[in-house]
């Protein structure tokens, strides 16, 4: 019972201290000449919709396809096909592929 009262008393003190603190000073930027500051474009980021964000991602990085950025889209819905060869007619067999580090069968022999 004493631990509960101590916890409640501590939370009450914490709430009173938080209420009494007056933080009216502005937050300053800690960067050189105001360039590259963290959070300098927070207003613009909150105004952008999701389509704008997707277009910026598609434009900036070349290894993400635009189809991957579309909403509710599976790159290849055909079973057994890889994402890279989805439109080809032949079926990919994952057990007949070559051995490499990415397929976790590659052994690092010294």
Curated annotation (Swiss-Prot):
The record marks 54-55 as: Required for proteolytic cleavage. Pfam families: RALF (PF05498). One of its GO terms (molecular function) is hormone activity. GO terms for biological process: calcium-mediated signaling; cell-cell signaling; regulation of pollen tube growth. The keyword Signal applies. InterPro entries: RALF (IPR008801). GO terms for cellular component: apoplast. Residues 1-23 form the signal peptide. Residues 24-58 form a propeptide. Disulfide bonds join 76-86, 99-105. Proteolytically cleaved, probably by S1P, a subtilisin-like serine protease (subtilase). It comes from the Eukaryota. The keyword Signal applies. It is found in: Secreted. Keywords: Disulfide bond, Hormone, Secreted, Signal. Cell signaling peptide that may regulate plant stress, growth, and development. Mediates a rapid alkalinization of extracellular space by mediating a transient increase in the cytoplasmic Ca(2+) concentration leading to a calcium-dependent signaling events through a cell surface receptor and a concomitant activation of some intracellular mitogen-activated protein kinases. Belongs to the plant rapid alkalinization factor (RALF) family. This is Protein RALF-like 4. It comes from Arabidopsis thaliana. The lineage of its organism: Eukaryota, Viridiplantae, Streptophyta, Embryophyta, Tracheophyta.
């Amino acid at each position: 019972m004493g631990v509960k009262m101590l916890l409640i008393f501590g939370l009450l003190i914490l709430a009173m201290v938080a209420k009494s603190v007056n933080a009216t000073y502005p937050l300053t930027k800690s960067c050189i000449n105001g360039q590259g500051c963290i959070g300098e474009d927070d207003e613009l980021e909150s105004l952008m919709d999701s389509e704008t964000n997707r277009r910026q991602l598609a434009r900036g990085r070349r290894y993400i396809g635009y189809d991957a950025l579309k909403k509710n889209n599976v790159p290849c819905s055909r079973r057994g096909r890889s994402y890279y060869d989805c439109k080809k007619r032949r079926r990919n067999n994952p057990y007949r592929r070559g051995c490499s580090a990415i397929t976790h069968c590659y052994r690092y022999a010294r």
